[in-house]
Curated annotation (Swiss-Prot):
One of its GO terms (cellular component) is cytosol. It catalyses: S-ubiquitinyl-[E2 ubiquitin-conjugating enzyme]-L-cysteine + [acceptor protein]-L-lysine = [E2 ubiquitin-conjugating enzyme]-L-cysteine + N(6)-ubiquitinyl-[acceptor protein]-L-lysine. One of its GO terms (biological process) is ubiquitin-dependent protein catabolic process. Keywords: Cytoplasm, Differentiation, Repeat, Spermatogenesis, Transferase, Ubl conjugation pathway. This is Probable E3 ubiquitin-protein ligase HERC4. It comes from Rattus norvegicus (Rat). It is an enzyme of class 2 (transferase).
Length: 1057
């Protein structure tokens, strides 16, 4: 051991020497053949811990700080600690803390401000005593200020006690001192790697390099850009991105070491202790310029000096106050910048010459500083081992984190047989949000040091793998312990406000734990976890949403699926029956799960759909609740102003309506909602008509009205007649049920006539003779024609007709692209829509965007124009102002494509589509419609192709002589199921007027087959309006096959009968 500095009280342990000041490193004979584990330096005393766990002290003992009454000039053993294996020590001005290998803390010395944590009344304690209030807590680090103390537990809890004159306890301004350890609750949840204390200021360092400081700040030693004391922990923002891995404090200054080996200092600089070649104080962290060319691996602070070790040269550098020789430079001069400590230093990596004697050179193992003294543990070049590197943490001094080594240790014990200490270790780890927040860090490329509001610093793949490795069926005791710790300790302690982004990580990682997905844990773990998440304050929730938004889609989906499963589980319980006494808690559970999904859905929409929107659909909803009743309840809640935007506690008294969370509804459920809404509006319109009719009996000025919207049309003038009636129709009448009457026909409209009307009028309106729509051969789709001579009223009528069809639950045959439905739902068409409508043009645009070279102008020769046909002639339209003079290049090609798409779908047809849009929404507008996705709305208007032919057979009804087991019916279905897909689709077209099925599926498509007279020579006949098939009584399978195929092959148009 080398030592230098103030020896006036014997604090260097050199024995009875004459000098009171040792100006340069001197060997201590006492430590020959002894290995030192740790050194603590007080103002006038020093404590040494040897590798065998014994403790020796020397120096001033006026206040009992040595823990013994022996010689003060040379190290003497503290016999009271003989039975303990001490692993670390720390010294205040005149008090000492010692930590044993069991995590217990012993204290002695001055106790004027309660800095020993013993809750005693004595001024000083001369023999070490155990701090009993910490005896049940496993402490891994201790740190002493002059009159206060800090401790870090294995569970990432920070305790403080002693003087609080300057706020150095971090407990607020109210208390002056604490005589027993107090938990700093404001830091709960943060994963810490170090605690440090200065004269009257304190620091904690997180695993990802964030620093929190509090206490005295007269000289800027907290680095917070001012000189105001802090009574609660404050984040040192300026160092967050610097990868700080170690921090140490002097009386009024602070030094921080980075992962790259840089050093920052701040605070008091009056003696040059900051190393910036000045005596100025620094209120912000500043890098020590003269050390920037070297990689520093160790730093230490004395009262008013600083030391740094550079392993590449093997040298120790020091700066600051030198009046007591503490710089080791051979003089008492102060140094304002790093200066080499005198000595024959030898680098561990250096080549050892044969002629170097072991007595002549020193290979540094570790440096220590405190008070006005400094020490260096060294070895000879011949026996030199690698020096300590403060950039690498000692696992024994760190908090619990879930890692491969720990899991391997836990799994190494046979199931049900691991010792109590292992159970305590598992319990401690999973009872602490700080420990979980320090687990699964993204260590590759030191990514976790970038933790912030946009990046979590977590390796989610590691979290998934380690959780699945830990939770295994053949180790049920571990799973039970983890579940119990989460349920009873971790989750109940969660709060809505969090001290830092690092305290949020477990909200990201815990859903990866298989226990969360176990339905047995839904009400005890998953839902309480969700409640804590939902109750987060706005700022931390926003950060969590940011983190979710950059997750890999499968990881994001995992969280969504978890809470969908919770919702389904709860709805199943509800269907079975919930006792009235449990209804309130059930409501809160269901609200919680749905609220979490709502937040996730918001994130998904904000990010442009991280996962497909339909991944939020809960398809079981239709089976588990009465959607119609749920919608009615929701409408009533809206009418009475019930607000479901507040916290879960308040929601417990509000019945859950799934309609409040419409993103969980699939297309079928939304269609049911729309139909329910339509029925309600129809009923309201009918009721209003009835009230008006009753009033007209007593008040002749009030005209009677029809409760239905009646359309009387002639087949030969169906468009003109319909337009005439609809032009005169009031908006409120569109909400009435539609009844259609064909002039000269007696049929009562029970739905079939209405269906026929829609089929006929849409066929007529889309006829090329009107020139309203342009037909695209490549895609077989139509779009609004900007060359039409028709009045916009006709487009308005088509919009009304489409709206009426939906409102009256009828499929219509429209060959529009998906872009139409996007625009109806206020979504922007994209290049994909252009590819659908105009495949060749769309492909060309994609080729333009994908072209890798820079010579786009020369290769494509394009400008911001579009060439269109105008009655046989071509016309050039500018897409932007001065488009003809604006060439398309690599920089603006995306703008060109966007402008092209905008012209086709928006600008060129704006007035026509606006008329269509107004007509459509006049009938069918409202909140429910906006719940649909474009492809869902398309499927509802024109049907879809999700065929289930067995379901069609199952739901078919029979009339006359037929029943399901009739021989003709049996061979009919045999023939039908043997038909190829295209023939089956032709059959649908033949029978229903469309080869597509309603969005509600085959179960909603009711076919009727009835027997007819005549022989087997007759063909089957379809009554399209009623989905009715007249089927002769065929007896031979082949005959039936031929006749059926003949009938559907010769079907033209809609085959209406």
């Amino acid at each position: 051991m080398l030592c230098w500095g103030n020896a006036s009280y014997g604090q260097l342990g050199l024995g009875g020497i004459d000098e009171e000041i040792v100006l340069e490193p001197r060997k201590s004979d006492f430590f020959v053949n002894k290995k030192v584990r740790d050194v603590g330096c007080g103002l006038r005393h020093t404590v040494f811990v040897l590798d065998d766990g014994t403790v020796y002290t020397c120096g001033c003992n006026d206040l009992g700080q040595l823990g013994h009454e022996k010689s003060r000039k040379k190290p003497e053993q503290v016999v009271a600690l003989d039975a303990q294996n001490i692993v670390a020590v720390s010294c205040g001005e005149a008090h000492t803390l010692a930590l044993n290998d069991k995590g217990q803390v012993y204290a002695w010395g001055l106790d004027s401000d309660g800095q020993l944590g013993l809750q005693g009344s004595e001024e000083c304690i001369r023999v070490p005593r155990n701090i009993k209030s910490l005896s049940d807590i496993q402490i891994v680090q201790v740190a002493c200020g002059y009159y206060h103390s800090l401790a870090l537990s294995k569970a990432s809890e920070v305790f403080c006690w002693g003087q609080n004159k300057y706020g150095q306890l971090g407990l607020g301004i109210e208390c002056q001192k604490q005589t027993s350890p107090q938990l700093i609750k404001s830091l709960l949840g943060i994963p810490f790697m170090q605690v440090a204390a200065g004269g009257a200021h304190s620091f904690v360092l997180t695993l990802s390099g964030a620093i929190f400081g509090w206490g005295r700040n007269k000289f800027g030693q907290l680095g917070l850009n001012d000189e105001n004391d802090r009574y609660v922990p404050n984040l040192l923002k300026s160092l967050r991105s610097q990868k700080i891995v170690y921090i140490c404090c002097g009386e009024d200054h602070t030094a921080a070491l980075t992962k790259e080996g840089g050093v920052f200092t701040f605070g008091a600089g009056g003696y040059g202790q900051l190393g910036h070649n000045s005596t100025s104080h620094e209120i912000n962290p500043r890098k020590v310029f003269e050390l920037m060319g070297s990689i520093v691996t160790q730093i230490a602070c004395g009262r008013q000096h600083t030391s740094a070790f550079v392993p590449s040269s093997g040298r120790i550098y020091s700066f600051g106050l030198g009046g007591n020789g503490q710089l080791g430079t051979g003089s008492t001069s102060n140094r304002k910048s790093p200066f080499t400590v005198k000595g024959n230093w030898f680098s561990y990596n250096g080549q050892c010459p044969q002629d170097i004697g072991s007595e002549d050179y020193f290979c540094v193992k570790r440096i220590f500083s405190g008070g006005d003294q400094s020490f260096s543990h060294y070895s000879s070049p011949q026996s030199c081992g690698p020096p300590d590197d403060f950039r690498r943490s000692d696992p024994s001094k760190q908090i619990w984190t879930v890692n491969e080594a720990l899991i391997q240790k836990w799994l190494s014990y046979p199931s049900g047989r691991f010792p109590v200490e292992i159970a305590n270790e598992i319990d401690g780890t999973f009872s602490s949000s700080g420990c979980l927040n320090g687990s699964f860090l993204a260590v590759s490329n030191d990514d976790h040091y970038r933790t912030g509001t946009r990046f979590s610093g977590v390796d989610m793949n590691a979290a998934r793998l380690l959780f699945h490795r830990l939770i295994q069926p053949d180790h049920p005791q571990i799973s039970q312990q983890v579940a119990a710790s989460l349920e009873k300790n971790l989750i109940p302690k969660l709060t809505s406000s969090l001290p830092d982004v690092e305290a949020l990580r477990f909200y990201l990682t815990l859903p990866e734990c298989p226990l969360m997905s176990d339905c047995n844990n839904f009400t005890t773990i998953a839902i309480p976890f969700g409640t804590a998440l939902v109750n987060l304050e706005k700022a931390p929730l926003k950060v969590l949403e940011n983190w979710w938004s950059v997750l890999e889609p499968p990881l994001f989906l995992k969280i969504v699926e978890l809470f969908k499963e919770v919702v389904v589980h709860l709805l199943k319980l509800y269907k079975i029956g919930i006792p009235p006494s449990e209804r309130r808690i059930f409501n809160s559970f269901l609200h919680t799960a749905l609220k979490v999904l709502e937040i996730l859905h918001r994130v998904n929409e904000r990010t442009g759909q991280l996962i497909q929107y339909d991944k939020f659909y809960i398809h079981e909803v239709q089976e588990l609740i009465d959607i119609r009743n749920d919608y009615i309840n929701w409408v009533q809640q809206q009418a009475y102003g019930v607000d479901v935007s507040h916290g879960i506690t308040e929601l417990a008294d509000i019945p859950v309506t799934i309609c409040t969370y419409p993103f969980v509804f699939d297309a079928q459920a939304k269609t049911t909602l729309l139909q329910t809404d339509a029925v309600l509006q129809m009923q309201m319109a009918i009721d209003q008509a009835h009230r008006q009719n009753v009033s007209s009996l007593f008040l002749p000025v009030i005209e009677s009205v029809n409760p239905c919207l009646i359309l009387v049309v002639r087949r030969e003038n169906i468009v003109g007649d319909a337009m005439e009636v609809l032009r005169k129709t009031k908006n409120i009448d569109y909400k009435k049920p539609l009844k259609v009457i064909f002039v000269g026909e007696d049929a009562v409209d029970a739905g079939g006539v209405r269906k026929e009307f829609f089929l006929l009028i849409m066929r007529e309106l889309l006829d090329p003779k009107y020139g309203m729509f342009r037909y695209y051969e490549d895609s077989r789709l139509i779009w609004f024609s900007d060359k039409t001579f028709e009045d916009s009223d006709l487009f308005h009528l088509i919009g009304v007709i489409c709206g009426l069809a939906i409102y009256n639950f009828t499929i219509v045959d429209l060959h529009f692209p998906l872009a139409l439905y996007k625009k109806l739902l206020k979504r922007k068409p994209s290049l994909d829509d252009l590819k659908e409508l105009m495949p060749d043009v769309g492909r060309s645009m994609q080729q333009l965007l994908d072209y890798p070279e820079d010579d786009i102008e020369e290769t494509f020769c394009l400008n911001f124009t579009i060439t269109v046909e105008n009655f046989g002639a071509t016309e050039v339209k500018e897409l932007v102002l001065n488009g003809a003079d604006t060439a398309v290049n690599k920089q603006n090609r995306q703008e060109f494509v966007d402008a092209y798409v905008d012209y086709i779908f928006n600008k060129s047809v704006a007035s026509l589509f606006d008329a269509f849009h107004a007509g459509f929404h006049k009938v069918c507008g409202g909140k429910v419609l906006l719940l649909f996705q474009p492809n869902e709305l398309q499927a509802m208007v024109i049907g879809n192709t999700n065929y289930d032919w067995k379901e069609l057979e199952k739901n078919t009804e029979y009339k006359g002589e037929y029943w399901a087991e009739h021989p003709t019916i049996k061979i009919f279905w045999e023939v039908f199921h043997e038909l190829p897909l295209e023939k089956k689709k032709q059959f649908l077209l033949f029978l229903t007027g469309s080869d597509r099925i309603p969005i509600l599926g085959m179960k909603s498509l009711k076919l009727v087959i009835q027997s007819t007279g005549g022989g087997e020579s007759y063909l089957p006949v379809s009554h399209t309006c009623f989905n009715l098939l007249d089927l002769p009584k065929y007896t031979e399978k082949e005959t039936l096959r031929c006749k059926l195929i003949q009938a559907i092959d010769h079907n033209e148009g809609f085959s209406l009968i």
